[in-house]
Amino acid sequence: MERSSAVDTGVRKDAGTGFLPKSSSPEIRFKTEDAVINTERSPAAYIEVREDASTGFLPKLPLKTDFPFGIYIHWPYCLSKCPYCDFFSQVKKNVEQEEIIKGYLDDLDFYAELTKERTVTSISFGGGTPSLIKPQLIEKIISHIAQKWPLADNAEISLEANPNSDRPDLFSDLRNAGINRLSLGIQALNDNDLKILGRTHNLKQAYQAMEEVLKRFDNHSIDLIYARPAQNLSQWQQEIKQAASFGFKHLSMYQLTIEEGTVFYKKGLPPAEENLASEMYNFTNRYLSEHGYPQYEISNYAQPGFESRHNQLYWNGSDYLGIGKSAHGRLKIGSKHYALTHHRIMEELTSEERAEELLLMGLRLNRGINKQDFEKQCGLNFDNFINADKLNMLIAEKMLINTNTTIKATDSGRLILNRLIEELCS
């Protein structure tokens, strides 16, 4: 679906850096169908909305809310590109980290003017490979955020890391820099599959990294990929049992998908047989739930209280900023919701677009969607928005569970989420 076009900010990015000139103090303008939102540097706690020339300006609207608010920092650089990865990343061994981080800080300043009365509840460093960032620069980013926004006392500050670092003090340095949640990209628990997946670490390095993370952090997670080439159910069952025994607070289990544009796609690698992938998924849910890791989202399992707070911002439709190349965000200003899809450009979401996003993300969660919250967030009546005939059909197929207050996908339904959304919104 095509979104309404956003207005340009009136200033141009520097061709060399991709960032706006540091000396600029831009006026930010967003065109919508019924309003012009016009904010200049400094009055960021308020916006002015002019509906038409005859009515003039309406009273200023405060931005401050009590909802969670997060900041995502995207580091797109990697030492190598995994053959299954379709995220935006660049293979570069040497980059000017200090200069890039300066640009990130400028972008944080820019958005702080719009949101500085919000309290930051989570910061997440993703990629790419954000563990390549120098720890002192990570500390600089965290400190800068804390200077620009109130930072919640219990803020979750998470970073994704690979197990193959040649820096022996990496994890202690990251902890000292302010990271309090560490997620390790293990992906497989045997050397052969690690090679197939294009990972640059071996199993010995994975175990060493896990030992260090468990020692240095109280909040931690590992990622594994299932439905790998030639993997059978018995092999995955053994791997799940191992993963549950390590003692990590959180586990992410992702089914391998063959995405267009990836190396696996270009090689014509077939996806896993559907029934096998379903068996793996169902065993994962059952075993981890029985061993202290209940599923809370389609790919995520956690000991109670250790669910990823930052990722829940996405699934709950909360506000977050995206900093760095290809990073995106969502932001509510006044009564309007905006998508931050391009560098410092905000595109207004229609109520229908907002509703579709809430459905797509919320149905990933085991608890589903609270209909009252849905209506508050998009301004549409749930029953009027949903295709009632298709809803009843999906309930009969045991893909959805619908009550007076909530709607949620069953285990089977979460495996075909795209189809569910298409049907419900048709």
What residues fall within each predicted segment?
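Short, amphipathic alpha-helical interaction segments positioned at domain boundaries
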Residues: 414-426
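Minor-groove-contacting beta-hairpin "wing" of winged helix-turn-helix DNA-binding domains
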Residues: 406-410
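N-terminal [4Fe-4S]-dependent radical SAM core
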Residues: 2-3, 28-31, 37, 47, ...
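C-terminal scaffold of the Radical SAM
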Residues: 68-70, 89-113, 118-383
